[in-house]
């Protein structure tokens, strides 16, 4: 994963901004750019320092800026609190931006409201889908079941006890897809594997944000014989990863390369089930520039288009057998061409 540029604070604003310029990265558009497109990114309260969704979304914008064929100027505004979301989007609207990218489900309602009020501006939101969005708004979603399936192959093959666990966030579609894929991937690799798993019950402010609960659940699974755990539930899942570190077990991260985003878990992290967020954002920006904006308000990223996968094995690269790496590569190819299914039917 590429490093994220430093952020300069603008004290008079409720947000922080970074400016990037397109057409080969120059500060002025190249002569070949008959039009320059302005793209703004609004983070959730996790900001760019999350090394996760926000940071990866901004990387996708930067990748678009670096592509001289797109002629992009870009700016990011970091939100300090939820009440900033619409205000920050409006800053881009007031400056006549061509496209606004927002990050995550926390911005779902606000993005919809601002998009409806500004039909001539394109909007894309990372990891969120609407049932009937306006034509200028598209959700960027992922086949979590495919990423989970690949991670499950690794977990199944790396387990020495024949038992693996998963600590999940709320039972909502993206999380459910991860679980189904992970468990079925493990069974694809080792038919006799035992899978343990638990969803976090609705917990108000602690939903996806209860590492103590996640740690307790993972510890209980280790007591039942599991020797590797998948933490797929935000900070709740991170608690499961910490339990693995403390119990000297293995773990699998989620969404992004958690070896980079959550260094406390590096000791146990074999890989992460990953959504290629930067790729999805650059794709949406490209669609805006090329006038190939998707109909139906949805862009789906999967194994076929390179939108999901697993992260590098990092410290465990020498411990993952070549045969396992080959199995993962083969499964990825088959998921991409449709000859292998994850078992998710939702």
Role assignments for model-derived ranges:
Residues 29-346:
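A residue-level marker of the well-folded mature domains of exported/periplasmic proteins
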Residues 1-11:
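Bacterial N-terminal signal peptides that target proteins for export
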Residues 18-22:
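C-terminal motif of bacterial Sec signal peptides marking the signal peptidase cleavage site
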Residues 24-26:
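Bacterial signal peptide processing site
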């Amino acid at each position: 994963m590429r490093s994220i540029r430093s952020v300069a604070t603008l004290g008079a604003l409720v947000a922080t901004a970074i400016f990037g310029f397109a057409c080969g990265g120059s500060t002025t558009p190249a002569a070949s750019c008959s039009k320059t497109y302005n793209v703004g990114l609004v983070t959730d309260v996790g900001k760019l320092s999350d090394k996760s969704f926000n940071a990866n979304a901004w990387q996708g914008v930067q990748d678009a800026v670096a592509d001289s064929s797109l002629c992009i100027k870009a700016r990011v505004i970091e939100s300090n609190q939820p009440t900033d979301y619409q205000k920050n989007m409006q800053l881009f609207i007031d400056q006549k931006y061509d496209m606004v990218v927002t990050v995550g489900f926390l911005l779902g309602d606000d993005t919809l409201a601002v998009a409806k009020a500004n039909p001539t501006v394109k909007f894309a939101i990372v990891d969120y889908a609407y049932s009937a969005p306006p034509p200028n708004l598209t959700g960027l979603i992922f086949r979590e079941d495919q990423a989970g399936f690949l991670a499950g192959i690794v977990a199944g093959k790396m387990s020495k006890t024949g038992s693996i666990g998963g600590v999940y966030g709320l039972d909502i579609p993206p999380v459910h897809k991860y679980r189904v894929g992970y468990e079925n991937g493990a069974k694809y690799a080792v038919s006799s594997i035992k899978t343990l798993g638990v969803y976090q019950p609705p917990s108000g402010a602690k939903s996806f944000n209860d590492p103590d609960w996640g740690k307790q659940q993972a510890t209980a699974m280790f007591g039942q014989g599991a020797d590797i755990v998948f933490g797929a539930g935000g900070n709740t899942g991170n608690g499961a990863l910490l339990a693995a570190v403390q119990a000297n077990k293995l773990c699998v991260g989620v969404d992004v390369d958690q070896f980079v985003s959550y260094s406390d878990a590096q000791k146990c992290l074999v890989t992460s089930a990953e959504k290629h967020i930067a790729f999805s954002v650059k794709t949406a920006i490209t669609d805006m520039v090329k006038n190939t904006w998707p109909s139906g308000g949805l862009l789906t990223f999967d194994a076929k288009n390179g939108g999901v996968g697993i992260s590098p094995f990092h410290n465990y690269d020498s411990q993952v057998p070549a045969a396992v790496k080959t199995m993962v590569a083969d499964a990825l190819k088959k998921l991409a061409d449709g000859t292998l299914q994850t078992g998710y039917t939702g």
